[in-house]
């Protein structure tokens, strides 16, 4: 987003892979230095790394700078590794909130965030999006209210150019196959695993089967949560006098009568979860 790249574009895929490669290289280098000082871990001789095979070798992937990797392999063969596993991408919701950034490897779930301070709660619009709109002369109080009424989505706001709408799609608006492909590309440099959340507004047996089969065929060891939404959306949040009028057409006047679990379980395409369908 900061680099103005669409999350599912080839540039984002290349960047994600390069970052993962650098993290893996740095972790191995540090572990090798520790092994030179304190000795390798006791099972190192039984590992594939001792035979010269690192994670990307097991995936059949060629790293970006093979020469430096060969030099690192030589050091590892000489000193070993202090750690048996190096990289695991974990969920970072709490840390991300404290640090004021977004979670881990996920796209943003909305361009609208709720912040809690000692003064109370307030809504905050994605600052990168605000900066982009300001640069193009599109930012105004009316634009802010439109984004808030759309619950953080900008896909239906016609005043916003298509290139911006593409960059600022939310996790619900991105193809999940792209998230899986990003994870698979990172996998060549992750020797433990990664917590990959997937997002689907209306899960069905067909959609889930296709999505998870693609993840399995791509070589993913794990996924994490499947995020879903209730069948009906909650009432829009009002933010000021300009929002005191009636809600947009089609907006429910009250909160959803179903929980996420009920909305999924009551789908005719999900009979296993419904006792009435047994």
Label each region the model flagged.
Residues 28-75:
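Short glycine-cluster motifs
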Residues 36, 40, 62-66, 75-82, ...:
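Catalytic alpha/beta core of large soluble enzyme barrels
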Residues 16-31:
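Short amphipathic alpha-helical coiled-coil/interface segments
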Residues 8-20, 109-120:
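Short beta-alpha connecting loops at secondary-structure transitions
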Residues 233-278:
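Acidic, low-complexity intrinsically disordered tails
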């Amino acid at each position: 987003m900061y680099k103005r790249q669409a999350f599912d574009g080839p540039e984002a895929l290349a960047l994600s892979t390069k970052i993962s490669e650098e993290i893996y290289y740095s972790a191995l280098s540090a572990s090798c230095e520790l092994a030179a000082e304190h000795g390798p871990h006791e099972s190192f001789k039984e590992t594939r790394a001792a035979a010269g095979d690192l994670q990307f070798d097991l995936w059949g992937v060629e790293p970006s700078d093979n020469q430096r990797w060969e030099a690192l392999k030589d050091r590892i063969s000489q000193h070993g590794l202090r750690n048996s596993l190096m990289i695991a991408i974990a969920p970072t919701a709490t840390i991300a909130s404290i640090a004021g950034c977004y979670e881990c490897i996920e796209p943003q779930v909305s361009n609208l965030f709720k912040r809690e301070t000692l003064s109370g709660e307030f809504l905050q619009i994605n600052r990168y999006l605000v900066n982009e709109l300001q640069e193009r002369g599109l930012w105004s109080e009316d634009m802010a209210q439109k984004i808030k009424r759309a619950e953080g989505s900008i896909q239906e706001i016609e005043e916003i150019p298509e290139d911006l709408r593409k960059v600022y799609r939310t996790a619900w608006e991105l193809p999940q196959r792209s998230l899986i492909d990003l994870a698979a590309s990172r996998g060549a440099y992750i020797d433990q695993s990664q917590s990959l959340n997937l997002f689907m507004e209306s899960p069905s047996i067909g959609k889930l089967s296709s999505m998870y089969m693609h993840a399995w065929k791509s070589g993913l060891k794990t996924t994490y949560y499947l995020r879903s939404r209730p069948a009906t959306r909650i009432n829009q949040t009002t933010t000021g006098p300009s929002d005191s009028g009636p809600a947009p057409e089609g907006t429910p006047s009250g909160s959803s009568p179903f929980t996420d679990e009920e909305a999924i379980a009551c789908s005719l395409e999900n009979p296993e979860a419904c006792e009435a369908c047994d």
